[in-house]
Amino acid sequence: MKHFILTTIAAVILVGCSSYKDNDKVELLIEKTSPNGKFIATSFSCSGGGAAGYFYYNANLRRVGEEMDQRDCLLGKHKTWMAFNAIQVRWLDDSNLEISYKQNNSPAYQDNNSVKISSKYGVAIHHVVKN
C-alpha cells in the first residue's frame, strides 16, 4: 500500500511538471530576421492546456539560433490570454522593431494590455495598435 501511494504521488508530480513546450501547438505565422541577421521577430499562435484549454496570438523576439519560447512574449501581462490578434512584425532597421496589432479593449483586458515590452537585447520595440 505504501508503495502504491508513493508511486501515485510521484506520477502526479511528474504529470504536473510536464513542460508546456512539449504540449503546446505553436504555429509560426510570420518570421522576420533583422537586417543585420542577429535577431528573429515572430508572430505566432499557440494552443494547449488540455480540457480547460487556451488559444492566443503573440509576438516573440529572440537571437538567431535560439529556440522560440511561446511564453517569452512581447505583448500582455498574462501570456495565454487571447488579447491580441492580426499581429505584424517589421524591422525598421537593425535596432528598431515595429509590432502592429489589434487588441481587445474591454475593461477586463485593461490591466493585461498595459504590459508591453519596449526593449529587448538592445532592440527598441515600437507598438502600433490598429483598432
Language-model features, listed with the residues they occupy:
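Mature extracytoplasmic domains of secretory-pathway proteins
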Residues: 47-98
